[in-house]
Amino acid sequence: MAKAKTKNENKETLEQTLWKAADKLRKNMDAAEYKHVVLGLIFLKYISDAFKDLHQKLVKGEGEYEGADPEDINEYRAENVFYVPPQARWEYLQGRAKLPTNGKDIDDAMDAIEKDNPSLKGVLPKQYARPNLDKQSLGGLIDLLLGA
C-alpha cells in the first residue's frame, strides 16, 4: 500500500520545483528578473486551477450550481474566483509550451485575464515575449509547473 505524502514532503516537492524553475531561467537573466517570470507563471497556474475546479462544478450543474452557465463570468465572480478565458487556461498554454510563440501566448493570456478581471488591470507581468527570454527554457518551465 502506498504511503500518503506528509505536509513536509509536499513542501519539499514544491521547494524543489521552484528551485528547478529558477535554474532553468538563471542562465538567461539575473535573479531580480527571473523571479517575476516564475511568480507570474505560478499565479497563472493557480488561478487556472481554481477556475478549472469551479468550471467542473458548473458543468456538472448539481446542487447550488444547477442551471449555472460555466462560461458566465458572473458565476466566477460570485465565488471569488478569477474568470480565465479559454486562450489563457493552463491546458491551452501547456499545449503550446514547445512553440516558439509561447512567450507571446503567455503575454496574450495575461492581457485576456486583465480584460475579464478589472481588479487585475495593469498588475500582471507581460514580459514573456521579450527576446532575451529563452523560449525553450520557458516551455520547460511551463512543463515543470504542470506537476506543481
Question: Residue locations for each model-derived region?
Answer:
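Non-catalytic, mostly N-terminal accessory regions of nucleic-acid modification and defense proteins
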Residues: 1-148
